[in-house]
Each structure stands twice: as structure tokens, then as C-alpha cells.
Amino acid sequence: MSKRKICIVSATRAEWYLLRNLCHEIQNDKDLSLQIIATGAHLSPEFGLTYKEIEKEFKITKKIPILLANDDKISLCKSMSLAFSAFSDAFEDLKPDMVVILGDRYEMLSVASVCLLMHIPLVHLCGGELTLGAIDDSIRHSISKMSHLHFVSHEIYKKRLLQLGEEEKRVFNIGSLASTIIKNMNFLNKKDLEKALEMKLDKELYLITYHPLTLNVKNTQKEIKTLLKKLDTLKNASLIFTKANADENGLLINEILQNYCQKNSHKAKLFDNLGSQKYLSLMKIAKAMIGNSSSGISESPFFKTPCINIGDRQKGRLRTQNIIDSEINDLDQAFEKLESKEFKQNLKNFKNPYDNGKNPNKIIKTCLKNVNLDTILHKNFIDL
């Protein structure tokens, strides 16, 4: 019997970090054949050519460049158009039995649309979540409706997919994909981090990731400058920045951060891509995470590291007690709360809702192996 071909598509470093262990599970199974397509920011020098991280462990089946030089609305639309055409050709060539994508990126909306029209079963990871301050929210729900199997990180997100009419037999709550990564991570100590980053970490460490405001792009420059102004007031601080993603105004944010770090090289450094080991090791020892990244919401709870979450970009996602939500103009109050006795006490006792003790990648792989492909495309809509 021929092996079932599973095609994993990844466009960003954040996606790959969560998909990597699943790829190992698939590759090590005698009944499955792994295909990997790298696209989007993975192939961009601006974002660190992160496809090279994939190639350290896997053979990339196809590389599909779709990013244009600019990141305005028109360029993003044209990138989606390029993706639609290129993935049509890729899937016609590879003939995958199933395609697996993660999350809510605009690139994946093109991939999902191609799968729909080509009658390829689509598996969606991390659906059912909310990010009401970003266009990602609409993209995520749209992808879910075009998908045939769903693997979510919490029961709340499972219920939301059922609200969208999905059949319960197609939706699996597997907990956070980050859980096994973090539990099995060989963390770097501070000395090893200093060597790897070429930076002294003898001050209070802040890990900062700030992405574009896709529903409020006009305020992006103002908000990032307001954040940097606040960071300038921190005494005895080491500031580690990671680059913004490939959304509209991502390049603008990265240029501002680059200039800031050059002027403040004694305390600040910007990285294209830290990689999961360095990133999680920094998260573990940081005084706080700052920004509007989903990792601050869903991964910092594993370490009980405080996270100052700025603005509405992650609005709607499940919160834990280590999260301090703040508007950009209320950062003084957020840092006051960070130092409060009550907040520090709460950090000791909260339960992480993203860790349910399961091995998510084994669950996904088992479903990919055993699902009936003859009937999977025929979906029902379940009314509440």
C-alpha cells in the first residue's frame, strides 16, 4: 500500500516552531510520507531566511516565494495572488493526500482556497481563537470553514468552531502545540545565551515583540515610538527585540527598531530570528515580555513570566494571570502593576490552561493516518 502523503505548509518562523515536532512524527511513521513547502517570510532576507532552520533537519520539498518588496495593502493582495497560482501548480505536482496549515496568516488563506478548489482535504491547527484587533481573526475563521479536520488548543476554541457549524467529530482539543516543545527543550543558561547573542545579560531582561496593527495601520509608527519612549525610562534594562512579521507596516516597524538598537547598542539588540531554543530560554529568564505577540499570551504562562500585552491585537484570546493588558498610552500603569506585590503573588498560584498533559503531535499524526479520505470532503453544517 502506498504511503499517505501529508504536505505541511509554513510561511513564518512562528509557524515552523509549532509545526516542527509534527513533521518529525510524520517523517518517522512508515505509513506516511512528509512533504514540506516553505513560503512567505521563510524565503526573505529581511526576515532572516528562516527556511535554513528547516533545512537543518528536513528536506524542503518546494520553496514558493511570494513576498514583494513592499508590504502595503496592494503588495499583500498581489502576494496572495502569486500564492494562489504557485500553490495550484505545486499541489498539482505533489498530489498530497492532505495539506496541513496553522493559524491565521493571509498566505494560508490562499493555500486553503486552492485546497478547496482542488478537492484536497485540509487540516487546520489553532483555529477557533479570537484576535479581534487584527484581520487575522477573519482569516482564521475563513480557513476553518474551508478545513476538514481541526486541532485546537482549548475547549473554548473547540466550542467556537462548533458555533461555526463544524461537526464535533472533526474537532479535537489537543492543548497547546508548544507544550511538548517547552517540556522537552534543552534550555540555555544565561552564560550560553550571552555567548550565542553576543550580548551581556547582566541587567533586567525584557523580551519584546511588536507586530503591525492590521486593523489600525495608521497608528503603527506612533505606537512603536511611544513604546520605545517608555522603554527608555527603564533603568538597568537589557532589551531584546525580535523583528515584526510580514504584515502591512512590518518593514516600517523593523526599520524603527533597527535605528533604535543602533543608537542604544549598549542595552538593546534586534534579531531577525532567535530560533526556538534561544527565544524560549530568554522567555524563561526574562523579567517580562512586552508587545502584542501571540507567544506572550499562549507561551509565557508555561514559565509564569509576566507579559505586558499592548493594545487589541490579541483581544479575545484566553488570558492567564501573568498577562497585563495595557493600552499604548497606559504603559506607566502596566509597569506599576508588574512591580506590585499582589501581581507577583498571583504569579505563583495560577494554573496554565494551555497545558492539558496530552501529546498533541501524536494525536494529530494518528488522525492523519486513520481518517477516511473517501468521505472527509463531505461536510455537514450543524445548527445550534
Swiss-Prot record:
Catalysed conversion reaction: GDP-N,N'-diacetylbacillosamine + H2O = 2,4-diacetamido-2,4,6-trideoxy-alpha-D-mannopyranose + GDP + H(+); UDP-N,N'-diacetylbacillosamine + H2O = 2,4-diacetamido-2,4,6-trideoxy-alpha-D-mannopyranose + UDP + H(+)
UniProt keyword terms in alphabetical order: Bacterial flagellum biogenesis, Hydrolase
Any Pfam family hit: Epimerase_2
Entries under InterPro entries matching the protein: UDP-GlcNAc_Epase, UDP_GlcNAc_Epimerase_2_dom, WecB-like
GO terms of molecular function: GDP-2,4-diacetamido-2,4,6-trideoxy-alpha-D-glucopyranose hydrolase/2-epimerase activity; hydrolase activity, hydrolyzing O-glycosyl compounds; UDP-N,N'-diacetylbacillosamine 2-epimerase activity
SUPFAM superfamilies: UDP-Glycosyltransferase/glycogen phosphorylase (SSF53756)
One GO process term, biological-process aspect: UDP-N-acetylglucosamine metabolic process
EC numbers on record: 3.2.1.184
Similarity comment text for this entry: Belongs to the UDP-N-acetylglucosamine 2-epimerase family.
UniProt function note: Involved in biosynthesis of legionaminic acid (5,7-diamino-3,5,7,9-tetradeoxy-D-glycero-D-galacto-non-2-ulosonic acid)(Leg), a sialic acid-like derivative that is incorporated into flagellin via O-linkage to Ser/Thr. Catalyzes the conversion of GDP-N,N'-diacetylbacillosamine (Bac2Ac4Ac) into 2,4-diacetamido-2,4,6-trideoxymannose and GDP. It can also use UDP-N,N'-diacetylbacillosamine however it generates small quantities of 2,4-diacetamido-2,4,6-trideoxymannose.
Name recorded for this polypeptide: GDP/UDP-N,N'-diacetylbacillosamine 2-epimerase (hydrolyzing)
Organism in which the protein naturally occurs: Campylobacter jejuni subsp. jejuni serotype O:2 (strain ATCC 700819 / NCTC 11168)
